[in-house]
Amino acid sequence: MKYYLAPMEGLTTYNFRTNWNHCYGGMDKYFTPFISNRHMNSRERNDVLPEHNVGMYTVPQILTNKAEEFLSLAEQLAGYGYHEVNLNLGCPSGTVVAVSYTHLRAHETVL
């Protein structure tokens, strides 16, 4: 069985993940809170810096409904040494739903 630490808005920053890993360990992957801008702000950048994620398999999560933003962020994250990203296709968080970042709602008939 694999154990993943899912992101929780406002809680699972790199400080939380680092402390969890130090105290409890046991996670196969640690997912970051989503990045939703083509240009990462300082909080988002700090969250994915390799030196803030030592000893953990960290997977940055991208939330966007624009292909060019996804590609730009994926390229930036590759520059930090990441080989995997998670594309969030529909976060139930109120702050996300209110801004219409979710992908699946627009294509419910396809599903």
Where do the model's predicted regions map?
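Alpha/beta enzyme core
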Residues: 75-84
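Single conserved hydrophobic/aromatic residue that forms the stacking wall/gate
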Residues: 103-111
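Glycine-rich, positively charged N-terminal anion/phosphate-binding segment
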Residues: 8-76
